[in-house]
Amino acid sequence: MSNYLSSFLLASSLITGTLWIINKILSHNLLDSKIPFNIKKSKIYYKSKQVVQTFASFFPILIIVFIIRTFICEPFQIPSESMMPTLLPGDFILVKKFSYGIKNPFSNNVIVFINTPKRGDIVVFKHPNNNAINYVKRIVGLPGDKINYNILTKRLTITPNNINEQHTKNISINYKYIKPNDFTKHFKLNNIILNNVHSLESSNNNLLQLEMYQEKIEKIAYNIFFKKKLIDQKDLYFKQFSQKQGTWIVPKHKYFVLGDNRDNSLDSRYWGFVPEKNLIGKVVFIWMHLIKKEGQWPTGIQFDRIGNIY
């Protein structure tokens, strides 16, 4: 949807821009004086000029919107639960497009470099296997990092600078259990199994309460969801050549991303790394949250969801 809108804005800007130039030329006194009086008074000329002026008037607005969406910021809506508890379905987010650089809107190549992505950044990006689909996840692995994800404890181990097989110390990662509250969500186990992403050790009932933890990678802390009884189907993991399943070394100019809702997220564990070229921008702000139930119209706006994302 976002790609179609960008194409529409570009096409509309080009068309209205052309009409804007034509209107300026036709309105020039020197050219206007050379047009015969009988032509200027004809209905066809009058209506044609009106049409040109009307469409040309949209050009300044369209070009401003196009520039803002392409180079400055762009709104997105969160459709799924993969980034809970940080981002919820119904959140409308603002993405800073120039966080890492100003890009060519056609080739997506960086024109002006600004900064490199940081560990912990929440980013919107084009899916590595389908550029028509936009995803939102959190960067946990930088180029050169060796990532290990334990399917039993749901904990990360990150060792930096592994591209040249250098031996370095693991990055400090700490986990702190957060007491359950009304925000913690229940999921139907049957639905999770049908997604072919998870299997269960055992279950005595139909509902499983996810647990909230604080994950702190060095100085960056955020909350995540997972349940130890829910075991990932490791055979579905992306298998990197020469690495054990569940272990990856992030190549140059690529990133390893995870959803904060670890048991309900298709991310780099399943389809691999995100090329730097695919990054659209960094999520910086929630500007609206609609209150709605699945299959129903929104019933209101939740104002306490509005604000910066850290």
UniProtKB/Swiss-Prot annotation:
Q: Where is the active site?
A: 82, 137
Traced from the root, the source organism's taxonomic lineage reads: Bacteria, Pseudomonadati, Pseudomonadota, Gammaproteobacteria, Enterobacterales
> How does this chain sit within the bilayer?
Multi-pass membrane protein
Q: What class of enzyme is it?
A: hydrolase
Task: List where in the cell it is found.
Answer: Cell membrane
Q: Which GO terms describe its molecular function?
A: serine-type endopeptidase activity
Q: What CDD domains does the record point to?
A: S26_SPase_I (cd06530)
Q: Name one GO cellular component term.
A: plasma membrane
Q: Which organism is it from?
A: Buchnera aphidicola subsp. Baizongia pistaciae (strain Bp)
Asked if rRNA-binding is a keyword of the record, the answer is no
Return the InterPro entries for the record. Answer: LexA/Signal_pep-like_sf, Pept_S26A_signal_pept_1, Pept_S26A_signal_pept_1_CS, Pept_S26A_signal_pept_1_Lys-AS, Pept_S26A_signal_pept_1_Ser-AS, Peptidase_S26, Sign_pep_all-beta_subdom
What this protein is called in its record is: Signal peptidase I
Source gene?
lepB
